[in-house]
């Protein structure tokens, strides 16, 4: 299901059809280097999809993962993470397949997410973590 669109991207819910693709790019060393995990497995992807189906965005707590695709395609190029930290406050993160790096997709997805969270859900404070 589409959540929102940007000029070049569609941000959508994740589902079982995304499991193999999540494992494919999230298990790359170049991608996981900047994430909180070292090894990403099929079991991790199944658990993530299950959690996404049980979670809704509210102002109290919880987290959600969204898929990133280019417009007109269902092929996952990455994903966005939203975690509710406090009322009107959320943190964000994203993972992008390294073959799509250096095209501005991460920036475009994050800017779209910031607008979506503010305009659709009334959030006004965002926290981002950087893994080096």
Q: Each predicted region: which residue ranges?
A:
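GNAT-family acyltransferases
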Residues: 1-99, 112
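Membrane-interacting alpha-helical segments
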Residues: 75-76, 130-132
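Short glycine-rich loop/turn motifs that provide flexible caps or phosphate-binding loops at active sites
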Residues: 77, 92, 103-108, 127
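Conserved acetyl-CoA-binding loop-helix of GNAT-fold acetyltransferases
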Residues: 102-119
């Amino acid at each position: 299901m589409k959540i929102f669109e940007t000029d070049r991207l569609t941000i959508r819910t994740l589902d079982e059809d995304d499991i193999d693709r999540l494992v494919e790019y999230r298990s790359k060393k170049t991608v996981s280097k900047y994430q909180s995990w070292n090894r990403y497995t099929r079991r991790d992807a199944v658990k993530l999809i299950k959690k996404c189906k049980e979670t809704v965005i509210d102002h109290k707590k919880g987290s959600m993962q969204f898929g990133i695709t280019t417009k007109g395609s269902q092929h996952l190029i990455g994903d966005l993470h939203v975690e509710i930290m406090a009322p009107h406050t959320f943190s964000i993160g994203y993972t992008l397949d390294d073959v799509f790096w250096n095209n501005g997709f991460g920036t475009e997805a994050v800017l779209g997410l910031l607008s979506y969270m503010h305009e659709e859900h009334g959030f006004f404070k965002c926290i981002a973590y950087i893994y080096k």
